[in-house]
């Protein structure tokens, strides 16, 4: 879903109108323009998804910088715990998540997922 949100943000940034965003999505993902039926259906789909996402609360994601591990001591059999620092997440910049974007962008992300999951994309890719 991260890649679909990234594509949706690009579509929103590069095109203002929904029809243009759908056209650009087809060009980027499938290498062709949508026909009029596809464009009309996908405009309705994105608008329906925008309404759906307005009603849904997307969870926010956080990344830990430390975790607690529990182990068993090899010779005595006693359990012990220690805190492990995860330096990889200290300066980590994650992709935008659903809870960080607008319902419209999530609707565009659904369009991107739809295209990414099409047989035509698998063939082009």
Positions of predicted regions on the chain:
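Substrate/cofactor-recognition hotspot
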Residues: 1-125
